[in-house]
């Protein structure tokens, strides 16, 4: 009788392990389905700054939007900022999604390809700046990388996401102003 009880305990234990493993598969599949759905049905941008990760206060978003709006009126260059929650994209697909967002939203004037998208994921600890072809003629990928490394990341390391974003934005604007003259 004790052998049957022992066997029954082992059997129930194995079934519970199977249930745990299948739950992980369901969760992984659900997350991937959600991510694919987000990518296929991107929300329309509601302003220059689209904070889907809730990194900025309303006042901070307003300030970023005003700076970008004033710069766009001055130069016709469009800059969009998007923060992306880690549930909406895997770390491996972050760069691809940021390019997809830039293209889908049509950041920049179509005839000038003069758009810039700053994509941020606090959850994945990633940032990507996508420059349109017209912007690439004004400043290089190396200059973009320097802005990320020197103006943005030092603030992000201190969890100062608004300050880092603002610093990077102002450096991009300053660089573009000097290059356009």
Protein language model features and the residues they cover:
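A structural boundary signal for the start of the first folded domain, especially the loop/turn
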Residues: 2-9, 18-117, 122-181
């Amino acid at each position: 009788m004790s052998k049957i009880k022992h066997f029954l305990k082992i059997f129930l234990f194995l079934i519970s392990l199977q249930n745990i493993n299948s739950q992980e598969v369901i969760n992984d599949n659900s997350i991937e389905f959600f991510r694919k759905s987000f990518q296929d049905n991107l929300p329309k941008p509601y302003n220059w700054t689209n904070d889907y990760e809730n990194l900025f206060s309303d006042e901070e978003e307003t300030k970023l939007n005003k700076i970008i709006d004033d710069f766009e009126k001055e130069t016709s260059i469009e800059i969009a900022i998007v923060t992306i929650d880690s549930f909406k994209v895997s770390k491996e697909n972050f760069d691809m999604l940021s390019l997809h967002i830039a293209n889908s939203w049509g950041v920049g004037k179509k005839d000038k390809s003069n758009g810039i998208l700053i994509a941020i994921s606090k959850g994945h600890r990633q940032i990507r700046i996508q420059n349109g072809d017209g912007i690439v003629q004004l400043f290089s990928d190396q200059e973009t990388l320097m802005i990320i490394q020197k103006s943005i990341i030092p603030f992000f390391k201190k969890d100062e996401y608004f300050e880092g974003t603002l610093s990077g934005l102002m450096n991009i604007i300053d660089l573009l102003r000097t290059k356009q003259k």
